[in-house]
Amino acid sequence: MATSVELSSYRDQHFKGSRSEQERSLKDSCTLYVGNLSFYTTEEQIHELFSRCGDVRLIVMGLDKYKKTPCGFCFVEYYIRSEAESAMRFVNGTRLDDRLIRVDWDAGFIEGRQYGRGKTGGQVRDEYRTDYDAGRGGYGKLLSLKIAPNTDNR
């Protein structure tokens, strides 16, 4: 099993550049992607947790691209790589708002990446969920649209 600071197999499919450029960016990056957040987790809570590992330079909350409300992820950027490595070691897999959060390397925040990429504006993973998850908006958004009663023909 890989240690926390090694690169995972996940790669952002929207990265602008070659695979080797992406690998290099990830290995030099001070930016982390944080996933599986509750929609109700605040920037202040994230700062409190991640600042235990070093000086946080920037937090960018992930937003629903239509509603501009939190949608369960963020980016955390440190000033130096070693502090980001500490966060990978010690924060990945911990609980925040009663949820196990995932921390992974990110090649660096670029404007526009703070928005969900799903059809309904949030994260793709929340669109098809069949279980109820109160911390992430209930049932999957596309499932909710399919089972919503049709009131047009009444």
Curated annotation (Swiss-Prot):
**Record-level GO cellular component terms:** nuclear cap binding complex; nucleus; presynaptic cytosol
Q: Which residues form the RRM domain?
A: 30-108
User: Any idea where this protein resides?
Assistant: Nucleus
| Alphabetical GO biological process terms | mRNA cis splicing, via spliceosome; negative regulation of viral genome replication; primary miRNA processing; regulatory ncRNA-mediated post-transcriptional gene silencing; siRNA processing
Q: Which domain of life is it from?
A: Eukaryota
> Quick one: where is this thing mainly located?
nucleus
GO MF annotation terms:
RNA cap binding
Which of this chain's residues are annotated to bind mRNA? Answer: 10, 33, 102-106, 113-117, 123-124
Recorded hits in PROSITE patterns, A to Z, give:
RRM (PS50102)
Q: What keywords does the record list, in alphabetical order? A: mRNA processing, mRNA splicing, Nucleus, RNA-binding, RNA-mediated gene silencing
Q: Which Pfam families match?
A: RRM_1
Q: Does the keyword Calcium apply?
A: no
Can you tell me which family this protein belongs to?
Belongs to the RRM NCBP2 family.
- Assembly with partners or alone: Component of the nuclear cap-binding complex (CBC), a heterodimer composed of Cbp80 and Cbp20 that interacts with m7GpppG-capped RNA. Interacts with Ars2.
Q: Which PANTHER family match?
A: 20 KD NUCLEAR CAP BINDING PROTEIN, NUCLEAR CAP-BINDING PROTEIN SUBUNIT 2
Any idea what job this protein has?
A: Component of the cap-binding complex (CBC), which binds co-transcriptionally to the 5' cap of pre-mRNAs and is involved in various processes such as pre-mRNA splicing and RNA-mediated gene silencing (RNAi). The CBC complex is involved in miRNA-mediated RNA interference via its interaction with Ars2 and is required for primary microRNAs (miRNAs) processing. Also involved in innate immunity via the short interfering RNAs (siRNAs) processing machinery by restricting the viral RNA production.
Q: What is this protein called?
A: Nuclear cap-binding protein subunit 2
Q: Which organism is it from?
A: Drosophila persimilis
Question: Gene of origin?
Answer: Cbp20
